[in-house]
C-alpha cells in the first residue's frame, strides 16, 4: 500500500506540485487540440447517412488531410523566424478551424442553400482540409510557447539552475500530453450527455442536435485564442512585478537566438506544396502514390541537408528514430469502413460510440500515468515495438467480429 501511495505521489501529485501558472497558455492550446474530437462522432454519422460518400473516398480524403502535418518542420522554422510575432499564427489557425466548423454547421442545417453555391461534397472537402491546417499551425506555436512558459527567474528575480529549468521543461511536456488526452476525456463525457436518448429523436431533431454540436465546437478556437491572451497577460504582469522590485523587467524573457533563413527548408517545402496541390487538383491517376513518392524524395533531401549540420554522434540516432517513427506511422488503419460496419452490422449508435470514446480516453490517460516509468527508462525503438505488439493483439477482436458467419458443414 505504501508503494502504491508513493507511485501516485510521484506520478500525479508531484506533477500538481510542479505546476506553474505560466504553463497554462500552451496547455490551453493543447487542450483545444484534445477537444477537437467533439465533432468526430457527429461527422461519422452525418457523412454516412446524408452525404452519400463512400468509405474509400473518405479514406482517400484522410490521406490529403494528413498532408499539412508533413509541413510541421517548415512551419516550425517559420515560427523561429517570426518569434516575437508567432502568436498571430494562433489567430490564423483559430480562424481556419472556425471556418471548418461553420462550413459543417451550414452543411447540416442549411444544406439546400449551401448547395446553391458549391456542391455539398466540395464544401465537405474544404472543411476537412481547413481543419488540419489550422491545428498544425496552432500546434507548432504551442510547442514554441512551452519553451517560453518555463520561467528563467523566480518571483524575486533570482535565476533558476539549469537542472531546475530542465526539470520544468520535462514537467511542461508531460502536462502537455495530459492536456491533450484530458481534452479527449472531456469531449467524450460531453458527447455521452448530448447523445443521451438519441434513438428516440425524430430525424429533424437529430439534425438539429448535429448542428448544435458544431456550434458548441466553436469553443475550440476560442480556447486557443484565450491561451494567447492569457500568455501576454502573465508576461506583462511578471514584467511589471520585476520592475517594481527595481529590476529591468526582461530578466524572465526567453533569449531566442536570431534564426537565419534556411532556404533549403522553405524552398523545399514550397516545392512540396506546389507539387502536392498540382497532382491533387488535376486528378492525376495514382495521385496519392505519386504524392507519397514525391514527398518522400523531397523530405529525404531536406533531411540530408539538415543532418549534415548535426554533430556526428547524433546523426545515426536521428536517422534511426526517423525510420522507426515513419514505419510506425505508416501502418495502415481500418479507415472509416470499420465505423460503418459497427453502425450497420453491430448497431452502435451515437451514445455508444461516445461511451467507447470515453473508455478509450480514460485508458489512454491511465496508460500515460502507469507507463511513464517504462517510457522514461527505455529507447523509443523498444517502446514502439511493445506498442505495436499490444495494438496487434487488441486488434484481433475487431478482426474476429468482422468475419462473416460461415454456415456449418
Predicted regions and their residues:
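Intracellular loop-helix junctions on the cytosolic face of multi-pass helical membrane proteins
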Residues: 1-21, 113-115, 119-125, 149-334
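Helix-loop boundary and gating motifs at the non-cytosolic
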Residues: 5-66, 319-345
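Juxtamembrane helix-start elements in MFS-like secondary transporters
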Residues: 55-62, 169, 349-357
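Transmembrane alpha-helical segments of major facilitator superfamily
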Residues: 61-68, 356-364
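Helix-to-loop junctions at the C-terminal end of transmembrane segments
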Residues: 71-84, 367-382
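Structural signature of the two symmetry-related core transmembrane helices
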Residues: 88-103, 383-397
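Intracellular juxtamembrane helix-capping segments at the cytosolic ends
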Residues: 137-154
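Single conserved hydrophobic/aromatic residue that forms the stacking wall/gate
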Residues: 399-409
Amino acid at each position: 500500500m505504501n508503494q502504491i501511495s508513493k507511485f501516485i505521489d510521484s506520478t500525479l501529485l508531484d506533477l500538481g506540485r510542479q505546476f506553474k501558472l505560466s504553463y497554462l497558455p500552451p496547455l490551453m492550446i493543447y487542450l483545444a487540440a484534445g477537444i477537437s474530437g467533439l465533432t468526430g462522432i457527429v461527422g461519422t454519422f452525418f457523412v454516412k447517412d446524408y452525404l452519400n460518400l463512400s468509405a474509400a473516398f473518405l479514406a482517400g480524403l484522410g490521406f490529403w488531410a494528413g498532408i499539412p502535418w508533413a509541413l510541421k518542420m517548415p512551419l516550425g522554422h517559420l515560427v523561429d523566424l517570426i518569434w516575437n510575432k508567432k502568436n498571430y499564427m494562433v489567430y490564423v489557425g483559430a480562424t481556419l478551424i472556425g471556418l471548418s466548423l461553420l462550413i459543417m454547421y451550414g452543411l447540416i442545417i442549411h444544406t439546400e442553400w449551401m448547395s446553391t453555391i458549391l456542391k455539398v461534397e466540395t464544401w465537405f472537402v474544404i472543411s476537412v482540409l481547413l481543419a488540419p491546417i489550422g491545428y498544425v499551425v496552432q500546434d507548432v506555436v504551442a510547442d514554441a510557447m512551452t519553451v517560453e512558459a518555463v520561467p528563467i527567474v523566480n518571483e524575486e528575480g533570482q535565476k533558476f539552475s539549469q537542472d531546475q529549468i530542465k526539470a520544468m521543461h520535462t514537467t511542461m511536456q508531460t502536462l502537455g500530453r495530459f492536456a491533450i488526452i484530458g481534452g479527449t476525456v472531456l469531449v467524450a463525457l460531453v458527447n455521452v450527455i448530448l447523445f443521451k436518448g438519441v434513438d428516440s429523436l425524430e430525424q429533424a431533431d437529430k439534425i438539429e442536435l448535429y448542428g448544435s454540436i458544431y456550434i458548441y465546437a466553436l469553443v475550440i478556437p476560442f480556447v486557443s485564442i484565450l491561451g494567447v491572451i492569457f500568455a501576454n497577460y502573465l508576461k506583462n504582469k511578471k514584467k511589471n512585478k520585476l520592475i517594481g522590485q527595481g529590476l529591468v523587467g526582461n530578466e524572465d524573457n526567453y533569449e531566442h537566438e536570431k534564426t537565419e533563413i534556411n532556404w533549403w527548408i522553405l524552398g523545399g517545402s514550397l516545392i512540396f506544396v506546389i507539387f502536392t496541390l498540382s497532382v491533387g487538383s488535376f486528378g492525376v491517376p495514382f495521385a496519392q502514390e505519386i504524392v507519397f513518392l514525391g514527398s518522400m524524395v523531397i523530405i529525404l533531401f531536406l533531411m540530408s541537408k539538415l543532418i549534415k549540420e548535426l554533430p556526428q554522434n547524433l546523426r545515426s540516432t536521428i536517422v534511426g528514430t526517423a525510420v522507426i517513427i515513419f514505419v510506425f506511422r505508416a501502418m495502415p488503419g481500418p479507415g472509416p469502413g470499420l465505423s460503418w460496419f459497427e453502425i450497420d452490422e453491430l448497431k452502435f449508435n451515437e451514445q455508444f460510440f461516445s461511451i467507447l470514446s470515453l473508455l478509450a480516453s480514460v485508458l489512454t490517460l491511465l496508460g500515460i500515468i502507469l507507463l511513464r516509468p517504462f517510457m522514461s527508462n527505455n529507447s523509443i525503438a523498444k517502446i514502439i515495438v511493445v506498442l505495436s505488439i499490444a495494438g496487434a493483439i487488441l486488434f484481433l477482436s475487431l478482426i474476429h467480429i468482422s468475419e462473416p458467419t460461415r454456415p456449418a458443414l
